């Protein structure tokens, strides 16, 4: 038996016992958190249209479960993280939330996703920038408008129009569905945008093979913002 030497604190609040560095409880928590979040960088979690504040109540839990299940080290939001129903070019529900209330609720939901996924790529969706289009249409200079990352206060997120993983092109999407873009761009495509379409199709040529993946969405289909699609044949 050999008694321990005295323990003391340094300016960095690090314990010293037998001249060996000891982490404080708070530092241990940081290290354990980093270890727990050390997912496989070769696996990517794709999070399709959220349309906050009208995303499904279980969307965040589902995404976190999928990250753990498939050990995903990369996170990509496929666009339309916001809905901006109040500023739609189409008729908005007069009994719905006003612009301020909708934004506050959306930011609250986004905070949950940012806490769960502090580093991510976010593809720009058509709904994300509806207020900018309204401002432009009415002659308001972009100098008066905050960018999306400034408004959301998510410094760990990178906003892009498209992203490539090898030879696979990821986009939010437009009126052209994924398999149409695959044939036009002659590359593999992963796309969001269409809430009622989810599939994988392939294109085989003599010297190449491509695929088109059309993702679904994580919306609450019963929310008033999606009343327009109630009668769609595909749900």
Region roles according to the model:
Residues 1-47:
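Acidic, histidine-bearing metal-coordination/catalytic regions of metal-dependent phosphoesterases
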Residues 24, 43, 47-151:
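Core catalytic region of metal-dependent phosphoesterases/phosphodiesterases
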Residues 31-33, 61-64, 107-110, 157-163, ...:
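A generic local structural motif
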Residues 38-40, 68-71, 114-116, 152-153, ...:
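Flexible, charged surface loops at secondary-structure boundaries
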Residues 43, 119-121, 158, 169, ...:
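Conserved beta-strand segments of alpha/beta enzyme cores
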Residues 57-58, 154, 170-173:
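Short gly/ser/thr-rich secondary-structure transition/capping motifs
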Residues 139-169:
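Metallo-beta-lactamase
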Residues 164-235:
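Conserved beta-sheet core of the metallophosphoesterase superfamily
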């Amino acid at each position: 038996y050999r008694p321990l030497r005295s323990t003391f604190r340094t300016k960095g609040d690090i314990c010293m016992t037998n001249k060996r560095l000891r982490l404080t409880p708070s530092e241990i928590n940081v290290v354990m958190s980093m270890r727990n979040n050390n997912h496989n960088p070769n696996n990517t979690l794709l999070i399709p249209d959220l349309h906050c504040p009208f995303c499904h109540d279980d969307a965040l839990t589902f995404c976190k479960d999928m990250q753990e299940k498939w050990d995903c080290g990369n996170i990509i939001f496929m666009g339309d993280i916001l809905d901006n129903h109040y500023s739609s070019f189409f008729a908005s529900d007069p009994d719905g939330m006003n612009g301020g209330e909708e934004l506050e609720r959306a930011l609250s939901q986004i905070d949950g996703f940012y806490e769960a996924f502090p580093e991510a790529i976010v593809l720009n969706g058509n709904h994300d920038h509806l207020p900018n289009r309204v401002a432009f249409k009415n002659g308001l200079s972009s100098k008066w408008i905050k960018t999306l990352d400034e408004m959301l206060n998510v410094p760990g997120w990178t906003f892009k129009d498209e992203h490539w993983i090898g030879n696979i092109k990821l986009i939010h999407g437009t009126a052209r569905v994924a398999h149409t873009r695959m044939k036009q761009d002659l590359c593999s495509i992963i796309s969001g945008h269409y809430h009622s379409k989810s599939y994988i199709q392939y294109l085989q040529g003599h010297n190449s093979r491509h695929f088109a993946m059309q993702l679904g969405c994580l919306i609450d289909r019963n929310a008033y913002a999606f009343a327009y699609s109630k009668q769609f044949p595909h749900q």
